[in-house]
Amino acid sequence: MKKILIVLYSIFLSFTASSYEFNNKKEYEIEKRNISNVPKVMHFFSFFCPYCYELEKIYNIQSLIKNKIDKKIKIQTYHVNFLGGEFSKILTKIWIIAQKMKVEEKIMMPIFKEIQENNTISHTSNIKNIFLQKTGINKDQYNKFWNSFTIKMLIKKNDNDINKIKLNHVPTMIVNGKYVIDYYKLEKIFKTNFSKKYIKLIKFLLSKK
């Protein structure tokens, strides 16, 4: 009888752990406004944000989301323009070009490092040189994308989506157009196994309506 009780108790503990639900106003908050026609997972950052750099350097957020979330889920990473002045718009354009060419993981950390540690990027030519060097893309391909009407439209969509959110700080994630994840708060809550808990939280919010 005692052995049966122990087994049942173990099953109960296992079920409790696996069925744990994250809490509103703790691991996430609910956006009051209705945000429609946006990707399921929206991740916002800036190359001018020191904390964005630290998160990416420690946890490899971009790759983590891409590899651990179901490929059928629409995920979009946005570079915001409200940090870094006018040059921020250049970086937004570079980021969108990188996404279109599927080389964003090759340029993300190099650009972060040059801005946050080396302070070597201050002109369009600087960023172009880094892009070409790290991706192996030739100048003609780069210039074609730089002057592309498609890129202009994607920049407009990028800015429109950000305006819908009325975002004023990064890094931030929004899931299903309403669940807001604040990384500052999250890192304090997830003191251990951040990556695992972070992905679990995203999947939990994706399952909510």
Curated annotation (Swiss-Prot):
Coiled coil location: none
Signal peptide residues on this chain, from the entry's feature table: 1-19
PROSITE patterns named in the record: THIOREDOXIN_1 (PS00194)
Alphabetical UniProt keywords: Disulfide bond, Redox-active center, Signal
Entry keyword Signal: yes
InterPro entries: DSBA-like_thioredoxin_dom, DsbA/DsbL, Thiol_disulfide_DsbA, Thioredoxin-like_sf, Thioredoxin_CS
KW Signal (keyword) present: yes
Family, per entry: Belongs to the thioredoxin family. DsbA subfamily.
Protein name, entry field: Thiol:disulfide interchange protein DsbA
Organism: Buchnera aphidicola subsp. Schizaphis graminum (strain Sg)
Classification lineage: Bacteria, Pseudomonadati, Pseudomonadota, Gammaproteobacteria, Enterobacterales
